[in-house]
Each structure stands twice: as C-alpha cells, then as structure tokens.
Amino acid sequence: SQALMVDLVGEAVSELPSYGLLAGVINGCDVIVSQTGFSGEKGYEIYLYDATLHAEKMWNAVLEAGKAHQLMVVAPAHHRRIAAGILSWGQDIDVETLPFQTNLAYQVPRAKEAHYIGKQALEAAREAIEAGNPPFSMVMVGLKLGGQPITDYAPDFWLISKTSAGEPVGYVTSPWWSPELETNIAMGWVPVQYKEPGAELWVHLPAEYADIPGSPVAAVVVDTPFRESVNPNQREILKKKGLAAAV
C-alpha cells in the first residue's frame, strides 16, 4: 500500500504516521490522504475534494497506478478487522452501548474539563464501575471457537450458553475464520461474570458450521486484539502501555 501511495502522491506519504493526514494531488484532483483503515493493516484512505465532479478521474488514476502493485478492488477482509478488535457500528455496537462495555473505555477522559455530549452519564457510569456496581449486565469479549471454518457473514446473531445444554446467556455478533490463527474467531456479548480470558462457553452455530448439526461448539474468551496489528490503532497502542482506560 505504501509503494502505491508513493506513486500517487509522492515520498512524503512514507513519513505519514498512523492517523496522520497529508494533502496531495492525484491526477489533478485535490485529496487528503490518511493512514487509517478498517483492518489493522498498514493502509491508507483517500478523501477527494468535489467528489461528485472528480470521482472517476481520481479513481481511474488509482487503478492505473495499482497495476504495478497487483491492486485488487475488494473490501477490507472481515476476519482482519475482527482480529484487530475493530468494532462495526450496527453489528457489534449501537446507540445503547457504553464505551466501558467494549474496548473503547480509553475514549472517555478523566481530566477533561470541557463539556461534551454524554459527559455526565459517562462519568457516573465509570464511578459505578469502579465502585463495583456496573450499570450494565453484558460486555463484549473476544472468542475463539470450534466448528467448521466460518466463511460468510452471519445473517443473524448466534447464541452463546454457559453449558452445552444450558439456556442462552449471550450472542455472537461478528464471527469469521482466521487463516492466520487457524481457528474461528468472533466478538460477542456475554454476562459480565464471563468476561475474563479463559472463561469457557458454548456457541450455537448454524448447521453448515457446526461439527455436529444441532450441537453447540466449545468457545473460550480471549483478549483482543486476537493478534498484534501491523498498523495498530490508538486503542491498541494505549493497551500495550497499560492504558486501556482513559486518564
């Protein structure tokens, strides 16, 4: 990706840090380039000025330059964004989700004096959590699970139970087969008491992915990201420094 972007906008893009921005020109079209993405890989996004006028002109230039780099026009690999612990709006989280229920607690600052939308509610939620009384019963976790390789988008949320024959206690939101880890990985919602890595659960997969149709597969809660990202986002960087929660 870097070599292609150098061809398009010049060597300056090589020095662009994660989440950095660079003004450039592609085929006469003004753009902003960012080193961001939806997969944990080292990738770039191009923002085009006056896109309704110049989209095809810029896009065709990208395709032409990409021929020398075996460029393929595809969406980010779903399993890579799951492996990176990147959440999908509407699939993993929604307007009712608190950052503290997911891996987004680092986005809620402790020392910010300025007002922002939701500040009072978020600070109250954090105080309750630190007092041992979280204002929620479910949290999002990473899971490694058995079954046949999951190779398509889940059309529904698959249920999670504590025992193979038990009642559902949670559900999977984003599952996929990870070729790097050689196992199915997923993100899902489970009761707070099962959030720690090593917790053993069961996932009720559809027949095409179950080892035995009608029977659940074993799963274990794991830390996220599932593997270190080539281009870690701010959440992953702070977590490695022991700052998973904001200061």
Q: What do the predicted segments below correspond to?
A:
Residues S1-V247:
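Conserved, structured C-terminal
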